Amino acid sequence: MNASGSGYPLASLYVGDLHPDVTEAMLYEKFSPAGPILSIRVCRDVATRRSLGYAYINFQQPADAERALDTMNFEMLKGQPIRIMWSQRDPGLRKSGVGNIFIKNLEDSIDNKALYDTFSTFGNILSCKVACDEHGSRGFGFVHFETHEAAQQAINTMNGMLLNDRKVFVGHFKSRREREAELGARALEFTNIYVKNLPVDVDEQGLQDLFSQFGKMLSVKVMRDNSGHSRCFGFVNFEKHEEAQKAVVHMNGKEVSGRLLYAGRAQKRVERQNELKRRFEQMKQDRLRRYQGVNLYVKNLDDSIDDDKLRKEFSPYGVITSAKVMTEGGHSKGFGFVCFSSPEEATKAVTEMNGRIVGTKPLYVALAQRKEERKAILTNQYMQRLSTMRTLSNPLLGSFQQPSSYFLPAMPQPPAQAAYYGCGPVTPTQPAPRWTSQPPRPSSAYPPGASMVRPPVVPRRPPAHISSVRQASTQVPRTVPHTQRVANIGTQTTGPSGVGCCTPGRPLLPCKCSSAAHSTYRVQEPAVHIPGQEPLTASMLAAAPLHEQKQMIGERLYPLIHDVHTQLAGKITGMLLEIDNSELLLMLESPESLHAKIDEAVAVLQAHQAMEQPKAYMH
């Protein structure tokens, strides 16, 4: 029977309990005999791209989906039985609990199929599952019927029955909130109290004598070990809640034989663990609120810096409540924490100290974050990079390209007209080096479509170094500001009529050239600084314009990455340049940190490639 809460037949199945290695191709091979399939999707984690253990299969015809549900449910796939049910698009139907029953005290050998076979006689089952962990069945399960009447009939018939020689409990499913509310209501009416820190010589009779004054007791028990010795705690169960409450009030904290007794409401282990967990979480949240915005994380510390030196370096920016350098075996681990008394002081310290050289290393200073927060931020950054990579049609886009040492901008030439250079020497256009104080020379630009020609009386002389120029121009050029281009002093152009013209907006410079200059034409190349050869310091980086800082770092990163991953050097460099500049400087100084980041980038690229493979298969 096809269950649909919306009035039209469904053709979509939910397939759960999948092996982590199951792919769309395996599911297609498994389910295609049932009928034509429109789509298959294995749900995966957004960050790791690992399977979440379930999938959705859309058939063309509802009858085919129903056939697959009836004939393939609980069949084995890669050594695991799969669980199939109708895909319910309405979450309200799944979460309402209508028709859902809870079964506990199940025998270990009862699995999903056995539970399904047992309860299928009462009506159509939408879902059936036995809760399991790494050790097997946890002894309880759930069966979701299509109707409330079928669920009620199953409860009336099966509750208290024997399944594999075990008496099972069957009842309506209750959410955790409902169960906790019931436990809270029962806790207010407790009659059983827990007593600990008893003297060793106190037995059941002694415990009864201590509590008999408060009312009638139904049972008294002192817990003992295997050898019969008292474990110094026990239980007292009263007939009425008021009597138990009175005993707790008067006996908790009372001294007996030199020991202070503890008396309180008896709790189950799970209840105690949940209460302790709530207390721990509350303490954790209080501590986080107390240190929110005032605790700083400091890394790349010099080995000579200890707690006192760390406090001294940060003390000018405010009142420090604690300063700690993390150590292992008495040696610094290279990072620590500084806690200020106010967020304003912490913000000032981050602004002033981040990137400052203390000892021999530049510090990295930022607000301390919890592991969960860091993981969320890294996941968000990964997803942003992933979405960017998806939009790139050209795999080379977004990559960092190692800039050529010099290039000539391409100038369009008329197809039927030869290009000639002027009488002045032509110098290859080159960006001004950023790491020297040498100012760029004045630039000269040609309007679009202008051709550099000589009058017809001068014989054609090709440039001497045109091959090297062409080779350089094939590399991907960097965008160069107009003020950094090298001028071709003395170059002028003439139109077809022989009338001299010059670049608009610039005065015409006189050309004083001998005929020998035309016959012995040479290209004079200035000295070229190869970028990335000199060390990059924090002061050099700070002195550079903001838009050039990443380029300066990239020029030094690219050769290092190219030595490790030749094919992916451009992409990896582009990904690493998204990191903060202070961290990039640390990576340039520390090969270990750089290689670790390279490995992370390679993992991201491989994950993206693995994600694209199923799409290629589907198409």
From Swiss-Prot:
This is Polyadenylate-binding protein 1-like. Poly(A)-binding protein involved in oocyte maturation and early embryo development. It is required for cytosolic mRNA polyadenylation and translational activation of maternally stored mRNA in oocytes. Changing residue 374 to Q: In OZEMA22; uncertain significance; the orhologous mouse mutation results in female infertility due to early embryonic arrest; no effect on translation activation; no effect on poly(A) binding; no effect on cytoplasmic localization. It comes from Homo sapiens. Changing residue 137 to F: In OZEMA22; pathogenic; the orhologous mouse mutation results in female infertility due to early embryonic arrest; results in decreased translation activation; decreased poly(A) binding; no effect on cytoplasmic localization. Residues 431-458 are annotated as: Disordered. Disulfide bonds: none annotated. The gene is PABPC1L. The lineage of its organism: Eukaryota, Metazoa, Chordata, Craniata, Vertebrata. Residues 533-610 form the PABC domain. It is linked to Oocyte/zygote/embryo maturation arrest 22: An autosomal recessive, female infertility disorder characterized by oocyte maturation arrest, primarily at the germinal vesicle or metaphase I stages. In some cases, oocyte reaching the metaphase II stage can be fertilized, but embryo development is arrested before the 4-cell stage. Residues 11-89, 99-175, 191-268, 294-370 form the RRM domain. Expressed in ovary and testis. Also expressed in pancreas, liver and thymus, and at lower levels in other somatic tissues including brain and lung. GO terms for molecular function: mRNA 3'-UTR binding; poly(A) binding; poly(U) RNA binding. Keywords: Cytoplasm, Differentiation, Disease variant, Oogenesis, Repeat, RNA-binding.
